[in-house]
């Protein structure tokens, strides 16, 4: 067909999966992105939106299922925006993620020989998330609902028991819902900016069993809070109950003001032997089982013997820094978010670690300044940047400092490939690469790479 229009129907075979988890199929050279499909599916689809050389379509029916297609466990898998790959066999998900890393390293990084180790998958790829944020709303019959947003929308898909989350979520949400109904608490409306209850944050320490609940409200205080606390304390492990004030017209979920209702205001958890204190506003990896494997790999790649000076850039609350400090002489952590550095310093104290020092600021500003003014030294540099990757000034300073090893932890293998190419062109050799599946059933994959100075 020379020109595709909305609602045109067609058949195609899915050949690949996009970065966002849509299946990719072609008809006469025209590329289609089709949600809820798996590589190998032959489907009938309906065009929803078309551009010059590609379009988006809705899968109408599966004509011939892929050998790697499975029945999703979750009843709302198709509507919910959280799991893009749940219809794909888990082993095939891992293969897809490995291929994604490999392809980015060859196409973007220009690497011809990639020393790639097998991806670290999960033995049990369900119930792995230690944190969930549930929005509240009303359905068409004016019943209170909570769950998750449908893909690319703010329409709530009712789901109190996400199979990626902890089993306690459902009981906690039922208590909160009953409390709202009992006392007639109004739900927040994004369009009118009226109503009180916005979200519920739930966190759990997997190794300690400690639970946290934080209600996000569009108001100064939470009515009938004593009754809510009394009910929530019936759940084993309940350690911290609070509310967060967020009166802004914003998509940001948490407000900066947190008022404590019960407990110490935080929960604790361990990654390996390191203890972490987690408040409602703390960043903490959501999959602690895989985080331990990811950081263990980073620590192994760092090759520490006890005498090294290590810089940990984009260090967050010091999760990798404290892991490294167990085996290094000195660790310096850098992070732009002041609250995260406060948490990092508290976590260092909590573990009695005196060989760690933290700086607040941008990695691309702190590292050059420390290098030029104070001639700081590094045997090993570890980076764990956001999705956009490392700033070029930061990479340039790493090259000037000349550490023996650079360990790169990445949540986006495309920007990883770009940055590895930059370092490889300036005296470093790619020695090892390994994927780690932190988010089963989604299209995301973490990667750890080791570069050594030639």
Which functions belong to the PLM regions below?
Residues 60-72, 78-187, 207, 222:
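Extended interfacial segments that mediate partner engagement and assembly in macromolecular machines
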Residues 200:
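Flexible loop/N-cap segments at domain edges
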Residues 1-72, 76, 357-358, 365:
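Terminal RNA-binding accessory module
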Residues 2-11, 19, 220, 224-235, ...:
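Rossmann-like S-adenosyl-L-methionine
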Residues 46-50, 135-139, 203-207, 454:
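Short beta-strand micro-motifs enriched in acidic
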Residues 54, 208-212, 443:
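Conserved loop-to-beta-strand segment in the C-terminal subdomain of adenylate-forming
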Residues 40, 165, 287:
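Short, conserved phosphate/pyrophosphate- and ester-handling motifs at nucleotide-, phospho-/glycolipid
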Residues 23-28, 147-150, 214-216, 344:
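Short, acidic/hydrophobic/Gly-rich beta-strand patch recurrent on exposed beta strands
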């Amino acid at each position: 067909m020379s020109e595709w229009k909305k609602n045109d129907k067609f058949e195609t075979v899915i050949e690949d999966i996009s970065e966002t988890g849509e299946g990719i199929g072609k008809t006469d050279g025209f590329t289609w992105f089709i949600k809820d499909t798996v590589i190998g599916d032959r489907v009938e689809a309906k065009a929803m939106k078309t551009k010059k050389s590609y379009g988006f379509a809705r899968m109408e029916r599966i004509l011939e299922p892929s050998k790697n297609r499975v029945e999703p466990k979750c009843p709302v898998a198709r509507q919910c925006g959280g799991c893009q790959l749940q219809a794909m066999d888990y082993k095939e998900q891992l293969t897809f993620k490995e291929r994604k890393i490999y392809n980015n390293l060859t196409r973007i990084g220009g690497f011809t020989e990639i020393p790639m180790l097998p991806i670290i998958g999960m033995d049990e790829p369900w119930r792995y998330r230690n944190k969930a944020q549930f929005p509240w709303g009303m359905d068409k019959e004016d019943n209170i609902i909570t769950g998750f947003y449908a893909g690319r929308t703010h329409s709530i898909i009712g789901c109190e028991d996400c199979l990626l989350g902890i089993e306690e979520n459902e009981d906690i949400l039922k208590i909160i819902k009953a409390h709202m109904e009992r006392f007639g608490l109004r739900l927040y409306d994004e369009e009118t900016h009226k109503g009180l209850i916005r979200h519920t944050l739930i966190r759990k320490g997997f190794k300690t069993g400690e639970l946290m609940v934080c209600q996000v409200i569009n108001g100064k205080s939470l009515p009938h809070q004593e009754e809510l606390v009394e009910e929530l304390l019936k759940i084993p492990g309940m350690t911290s109950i609070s509310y967060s004030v967020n009166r802004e017209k914003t998509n940001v979920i948490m407000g900066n003001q947190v008022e404590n209702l019960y407990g110490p205001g935080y929960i604790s958890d361990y990654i390996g032997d390191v203890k972490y204190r987690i408040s409602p506003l703390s960043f903490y990896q959501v999959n602690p089982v895989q985080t331990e494997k990811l950081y263990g790999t980073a620590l192994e790649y760092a090759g520490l013997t006890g005498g090294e000076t290590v810089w940990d850039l984009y260090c967050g609350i010091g999760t990798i820094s404290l892991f490294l400090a167990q085996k290094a002489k000195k660790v310096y952590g850098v992070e732009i978010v002041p609250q995260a550095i406060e948490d990092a310093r508290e976590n260092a104290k909590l573990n009695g670690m005196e060989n760690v020092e933290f700086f607040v600021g941008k990695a691309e500003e702190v590292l050059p300044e420390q290098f030029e003014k104070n001639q700081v030294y590094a045997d090993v540099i570890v980076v764990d940047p956001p999705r956009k990757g490392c700033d070029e000034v930061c990479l340039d300073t790493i090259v000037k400092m000349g550490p023996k090893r650079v360990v790169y932890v990445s949540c986006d293998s495309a920007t990883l490939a770009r940055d590895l190419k930059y370092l490889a062109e300036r005296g470093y050799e790619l020695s090892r690469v390994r994927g780690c599946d932190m988010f089963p059933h989604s299209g995301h994959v973490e990667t750890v790479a080791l570069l050594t100075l030639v």
